[in-house]
UniProtKB/Swiss-Prot annotation:
Residues at which ATP binds: K411
Keyword Aminoacyl-tRNA synthetase among record annotations: yes
Species for this entry: Saccharomyces cerevisiae (strain ATCC 204508 / S288c) (Baker's yeast)
Listed name of the protein: Methionine--tRNA ligase, cytoplasmic
Assembly with partners or alone: Component of a yeast aminoacyl-tRNA synthase (aaRS) complex formed by methionyl-tRNA synthase MES1, glutamyl-tRNA synthase GUS1 and the tRNA aminoacylation cofactor ARC1 in a stoichiometric complex. Interacts (via N-ter) with ARC1 (via N-ter). Can also form a stable binary complex with ARC1 that is functional in terms of aminoacylation. ARC1 increases the affinity for cognate tRNAs due to the presence of a tRNA binding domain in the middle and C-terminal part of ARC1.
Compartments, record wording: Cytoplasm
Lineage: Eukaryota, Fungi, Dikarya, Ascomycota, Saccharomycotina
Region described as Interaction with ARC1: spans on this chain: 36-92
Keyword ATP-binding: yes
The EC number(s) this enzyme carries: 6.1.1.10
GO molecular function: ATP binding; methionine-tRNA ligase activity; sequence-specific mRNA binding
Remaining remarks: Present with 85000 molecules/cell in log phase SD medium.
GO cellular component: aminoacyl-tRNA synthetase multienzyme complex; cytoplasm; cytoplasmic stress granule; cytosol; methionyl glutamyl tRNA synthetase complex
Residue ranges annotated as motif 'KMSKS' region: 525-529
Length: 751
């Protein structure tokens, strides 16, 4: 006799019923008796067994299997009745009642399918097929190794079941390797034994201006990226900052605005805080220097220096404005630079050549407030005897700069100070708004910002926690990382460390110094005083998300030389890098997994993807290089490497040709590609989060996963059975027409 057998291809049957039917057909082919070897008819869409020479037709899968195996025993047994009455009825449900399925399939295995060993009867195989179609994961867990013929039949049956998302049940399950995630944040962050404790500071922004983009990337954003990296690595890190509020500039600005210095500081502290919140700067504490703790700690350090012989009195010539009857802070004197002859140099520094100046060095000095010619006057002041501390400072700098891998410009600037020889520097001023000098003779003077401001790091920490000394008097267990623009370097490598050394107390001192050069605006310069460039409030008004601003600023971070903000480059990077690379990779795969797998990660064998070992090698190299660069504070390079992982993910999808054809015709490979691909997205999210925390959160939300810790090795942390959420767009295309509009609108006017 000549028989043809065909698989169930009915589109009306639920996928689980179709799988059960086709598994029985496949089992029939594997277990066919010697007298009956049917041939497969792939052109027939109906499930049947028919004789091509005689009028004979069977169209029930159970009957076909019994006939082909020539085994009609057991049809009245409890086992067979359970297979039909209890299990087969479930197969006709479009939506399986999962709780009911779990109970009945477990009962089937415990009572009727205790072992799956040859010889197997037709009744055994019918029961197996029904259980497998309803709960394949249970079968695989109970029987890790299926009998050879059964294994072959399962593989064949799957090929004849059109895959659709209805066979994957998304119940929001989270199946993540827990030891690979980021630890939750402590309510109060304090150093811990046997952990890497890192104290991170950003240069304290001066309070009386809106920060521009150069200020933001030069200190707070750079520090934030590193702090988020540390926390992503599960280091024990504390990130503090605050506004620097004392000094002549505040007094004078308050006079201009007709308010008290305190009112001015309150106003601008909120402006700074709001700008940084919008930029998603994740301070653990953002404070200010106008506090009782600042007075207490600064006066303590002053007193210790005095008692140890590192302070001295000198009479100092200062510039005095005869029009508004006040001593002028260095930055409120302007004139011609004696070095480069720039006409608008300030009394403390030339914006053009960067030289540090004394106001008396300026050619034709003038009062910034009223253009009057200032007069020299003498006043007694306290000086920090840096000359007496020079050998200690030099020895410390040599050791700390090497151990802490200071950036090149940090070393160069510090060495230029040391090379010229340190001289006593004035640390008091004739002002009202400041930390009072704790000496009777000088009770009407205050501590100068050069000395006072850096102590703000300590006082701000003390306002965060009463246990602040665990951070600041704990050099054996705490590493201090500081971020700033290059103009702040001497205060952090000479003045502040000198003050710490002079107290002869056990201070936590600078370990790693990370400095930036200047970020220029288009073809000009940012300037706080002149309002040239894009400021924080302008960025908020642009309608572009803070993630894009953070990304762009990090990508042009002036690490070794000055760099430029360009509107053309800003738009191009959004469209070609964020949208076309990162956004495309994440969106394409997550949409595919939702469309084809109903958001469920299938059982997978990673070896089924093309050159899996080569892929892992590539990813491990990317991750290890990322960690290496970030540990050194090379954030610009770290971002390039992070984006290269996204590009490698796109390449991975192309290499494996992930599409509908792969899903339907090569299910095992498709399953592996989506599972491995989702884990690449998870890794991308971990290393992109320091730069764009909101994007990292969005990706993790789509993945329905907690934050993955940053590692230098690739892990398959998302496991089989994990359920993801729907895709959402991460980025939007920016119309190139906006370039000229923004260039005109944000051409340097500060609100």
């Amino acid at each position: 006799m000549s028989f043809l057998i065909s698989f169930d291809k009915s589109k009306k049957h639920p996928a689980h019923l179709q799988l059960a039917n086709n598994l029985k057909i496949a089992l029939a082919l594997e277990y066919a008796s010697k007298n009956l070897k049917p041939e497969v008819d792939n052109d027939n869409a109906a499930m049947e067994l028919r004789n091509t020479k005689e009028p004979f037709l069977l169209f029930d899968a159970n009957a076909i299997l019994r006939y082909v195996m020539d085994d009609f025993e057991g049809q009245t047994s409890d086992k067979y009745q359970f297979a039909l009455a209890s299990l087969q009825n479930l197969l006709y449900h479009k939506e399986l009642p999962q709780q009911h399925v779990e109970v009945l399939t477990n009962k089937a295995i415990e009572n009727y399918l205790v072992e799956l060993k040859e010889p197997l009867t037709t009744t055994d195989l019918i029961l197996f097929a029904n259980v497998y179609a309803l709960n394949s994961s249970l079968v695989h867990s109970k029987f890790p190794e299926l009998p050879s013929k059964v294994h072959n039949a399962v593989a064949l049956a799957k090929k004849h079941v059109p895959r659709d998302s209805s066979s994957f049940k998304n119940i929001g399950a989270v199946k993540i390797q827990a030891d690979l995630t980021v630890k939750p944040k402590d309510s109060e962050i304090l150093p811990k034994p046997n952990e890497r404790n890192i104290l991170i500071t950003s240069a304290l922004p001066y309070v009386n201006n809106v920060p521009h983009l150069g200020n933001i990337i030069g200190s707070v954003l750079s520090a934030d990226i590193f702090a988020r990296y540390c926390k992503g690595r599960n280091y024990n890190a504390l990130f503090i900052c605050g506004t620097d509020e004392y000094g002549t500039a505040t007094e004078t600005k308050a006079l201009e605005e007709g308010v008290t210095p305190r009112q001015l500081c309150d106003k601008y502290h909120k402006i700074h805080s709001d700008v940084y919140k919008w930029f998603q700067i994740g301070f653990d504490y953002f404070g200010r220097t106008t506090t009782d703790k600042q007075t207490e700690i600064a006066q303590h350090i002053f007193t210790k220096l005095n008692s140890n012989g590192y302070l001295e009195e000198q009479s100092m010539k200062q510039l005095y404005c005869p029009v508004h009857n006040s001593y002028l802070a260095d930055r409120y004197v302007e004139g011609e630079c004696p070095k480069c002859h720039y006409d608008d140099a300030r009394g403390d520094q030339c914006d053009k050549c960067g030289a540090l100046l004394d106001p008396f060095e300026l050619i034709n000095p003038r009062c910034k407030l009223d253009d009057a010619s200032p007069e020299p006057k003498y006043s007694d002041h306290i000086f920090l005897s840096l000359d007496k501390l020079e050998s200690q400072i030099s020895e410390w700098v040599e050791k700390a700069s090497e151990e802490g891998n200071w950036s090149k410009n940090s070393k160069t600037i510090t060495q230029s100070w040391l090379k010229d020889g340190l001289k006593p520097r004035c640390i008091t001023r004739d002002l009202v708004w400041g930390t009072p000098v704790p000496l009777e003779k000088y009770k009407d003077k205050v501590l100068y910002v050069w000395f006072d401001a850096t102590i703000g790091y300590v006082s701000i920490t003390s306002n965060y926690t009463k246990e602040w000394k665990q951070w600041w008097n704990n050099p054996e267990h705490v590493s201090l990382y500081q971020f700033m623009g290059k103009d702040n370097v001497p205060f952090h490598t000479v003045v502040f460390p000198g003050s710490q050394l002079g107290t002869e107390e056990n201070w936590t001192m600078l370990h790693h110094l990370n400095t930036t050069e200047y970020l220029q605006y288009e073809n000009g310069k940012f300037s706080k005083s002149r309002g040239v460039g894009v400021f924080g409030n302008n960025a908020q008004d642009s309608g572009i998300s803070p993630s894009v601003w953070r990304y762009y600023l990090a990508s042009v971070r002036p690490e070794s030389s000055d760099s430029h903000f360009s509107w053309d480059d800003f738009v191009a990077r959004n469209n070609s890098e964020l949208l076309a690379n990162l956004g495309n990779f994440v969106n394409r795969l997550i949409k595919f997994v939702n469309a084809k797998y109903n958001g469920v990660v299938p059982k997978f064998d990673p070896k089924k993807v093309s050159n899996y070992d080569g892929l892992v090698k590539d990813i491990n190299e990317i991750l290890s290089n990322y960690v290496k660069e970030m540990e050194l504070g090379h954030e610009r390079r770290g971002l390039e490497i992070a984006m290269s992982l996204s590009a490698r993910g796109n390449q991975f999808l192309q290499e494996n040709k992930l599409d509908n054809t792969l899903f339907s015709q090569s299910p095992e490979k498709s399953d592996a590609v989506v599972a491995v691909g989702l884990n690449i997205i998870y890794a991308v999210s971990s290393i992109i989060t320091p730069y764009m925390p909101e994007i990292g959160e969005k990706i993790n939300k789509m993945l329905n996963a907690p934050a993955l810790k940053i590692d230098d090795r690739f892990h398959l942390a998302i496991l089989e059975g994990h359920n993801i959420n729907k895709a959402e767009y991460l980025f939007q295309r920016i119309d190139e027409k906006k370039i000229d509009e923004w260039r005109a609108k944000y051409g340097g006017q500060q609100v």
